[in-house]
A protein has these predicted regions:
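Mobile "lid/hinge" segments at catalytic clefts and subdomain interfaces of large enzymes
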Residues: 136-167, 245-315
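Catalytic-core signal marking the mid-to-C-terminal active-site face
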Residues: 273-376
């Protein structure tokens, strides 16, 4: 991931626009002002103009379009191959589209018709066809934030990520030194966020030992969609900072913080700056990244980490005893379980049983409006 000088990659989300020159300006603006990597929501426009003057060998690009089809991913890979040929350097990049969770997420939250039962096999085929030329590109990404959106509990999130990896290892045998990334949702529970990432490391290490493989794993923290409310955009920033700090302490390799206006529309420049500066302050003023394991030795967190890892391991065994994750995601009982969890949390927030500052408690009597442009 070319992340040799930073504790974690500061990854900026680039708001999409039909104006390719503006899109290029946004990418360059983020990189020039503190971001070290960036995430594009689509790859259907003119990529040469969008990425003009961007050195992908030092600034990784990640494609995260949950509605993309196989052709868009192929176009992305072909562009990276062409970029390598022209620039004589290896691009750093990732396809941040979970081959298992994405389709389920789309069924609930979008009207996309690009679902594919063979998404994992398609990625394996792309990987095999280009692996010698794209050594710094990650083709396999498993996204706990999608499962979190769907209603997965903390234990569910870890076990579903681990079971997704098992499915990959079951299908793809040429997997030594394989690059795989795991994304974790960072919510309002500070200590649980830290313990979740640490517990997942234990679980994944056990799986690698079991399968006798040596994977190149990237751990990613992403602010959960449950942090953001239209009613309290300014308070959203407090929740983002809390979640970002927990991800930093957990030792993620890349941190993605959504702007405080993410539920309203495109982030204005001052909001994008605030989001970048959240990372920069954590890195350069708190110096958390200079400590190998900031939470190591804390009895509470060590015990919580172990308890979560043990429960997740039990759940993984249950999933595998029932023919793995591909069988699980077709089980209506499991899907109903996720939906019930999601609805329960919404009901508890509506009733005030779960407190959200600025939403159902301590509302701002004179909220300051933030003017935003709608998403394109």
């Amino acid at each position: 991931n070319n992340n040799t000088d930073l504790p974690w990659h500061i990854c900026s989300i680039i708001d999409d626009t039909s104006d390719v020159n503006l899109l290029n300006t946004r990418v360059l603006g983020e990189l020039e002002r503190g971001a070290s990597s960036f995430e594009l929501p689509s790859f259907s426009k003119n990529p040469k103009r969008v990425l003009n003057k961007v050195d992908l060998s030092i600034a990784p690009i990640y494609l995260r379009n949950l509605k993309c089809n196989e052709n868009e991913i192929k176009d992305f890979v072909n562009f990276l191959l062409e970029w390598r040929k022209i620039n004589k350097k290896d691009p750093c990049a990732g396809i941040d589209v979970d081959p298992i969770a994405t389709d389920i997420w789309n069924n609930y939250f979008s009207n996309s018709n690009n679902n594919s039962k063979d998404r994992l096999k398609d990625l394996i085929s792309l990987k095999e066809n280009s692996q010698n030329n794209l050594i710094n590109v990650n083709f396999f990404h498993f996204d706990g934030s999608l499962w979190n959106d769907l209603g997965a509990s903390l234990i569910d999130e870890i076990s579903l990520l681990a079971s997704s990896l098992i499915e990959l290892l079951r299908i793809y045998k040429n997997n030594n030194k394989l690059k795989v990334s795991f994304c974790y949702s960072l919510g309002t529970d500070f200590f649980s966020n830290i313990a979740k990432v640490r517990a997942s490391r234990l679980v994944l290490t056990n799986l690698m030992n079991h399968f006798e493989v040596d994977l190149d794993i990237t751990h990613i923290g992403r602010t959960s969609s449950s942090l953001f409310y239209k009613e309290s955009p300014w308070i959203n920033q407090l929740r983002v900072t809390n979640a970002g700090l927990s991800g930093a302490i957990a030792g993620v390799d890349r941190l993605v913080c959504h702007p405080l206006t993410s539920k309203l529309g495109q982030a204005p420049e001052f909001v994008r700056r605030l989001t970048r500066n959240t990372h920069i302050i954590l890195q350069e003023e708190s110096h958390i990244g200079k400590i190998q394991d900031p939470s190591g030795g804390s009895f509470y967190l060590e015990k919580l980490t172990e308890d979560i890892a043990r429960e997740a391991w039990k759940r993984i065994k249950e999933i595998e005893e029932n023919k793995g994750i591909t069988n699980l995601i077709q089980n209506k009982k499991f899907l109903n379980h996720l939906e019930k969890n999601r609805n329960n949390e919404i009901d508890k927030i509506s009733s005030g049983q779960i407190k959200r500052v600025g939403v159902n408690t301590y509302q701002d009597p004179n909220p300051r409006e933030i003017k935003v442009k709608p998403y394109e």
